[in-house]
Amino acid sequence: DPRGCLYGCNGSCNARCADYVEYILAKEGDVAAVVVETVRCTDVQIPPRAYYETLRRACDRHGALLVLDEIPICLGRTGRMFAFEHYGIVPDMVVLGKGLGGGVFPLAALLARADLDVAAEGALGHYTHEKSSVGCAAGLATLEVIEDERLLQRSTDLGARALGQLKAMQARQEAVADVRGIGLLLGVELQDAAVAEDVLYRCLAKG
């Protein structure tokens, strides 16, 4: 959150935190990967382009992988199939989930550069219902619907409209501290925790 930034960005992100990541990579010398949630889902923190450009250069310079967690925001929520497409960079790995199964079946995926797409003879851990053929069918159907119904453009258009309406509401409501959005990933930040809790339960009551 730029307003609470420890690096003195004074309310507008200057990507100094990304410079600090490079400092750590240089000092440590043996960091395997930098793992980042591309756009923070829970409170919709949207980094500037310079942030990811700096991270990408830093990882390349110091031999670390850039791994992006897009589990909660993948496949169109931001108006692009992958949120990292907004930043003009390509990660070494990207993790997908949630929406990948169309909201009806648990499914996750790890996409990787071709030279990293290797598997050992034995592996542990996995799950998310262990490579189910039903889940894979749901995932393929989801991708087809996104493409056939042009849902990426729909997300962009509806998101812009919704963000405009929310910003108009912000101008009328003193309780609203900030409004942020990218595609249909939208966030409204309220000034007061008690007001936020009241709004939460009113929303739940209305379904």
Question: Which ranges hold each PLM region?
Answer:
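Conserved N-terminal phosphate-binding loop of PLP-dependent enzymes in the Aspartate aminotransferase
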Residues: 1-207
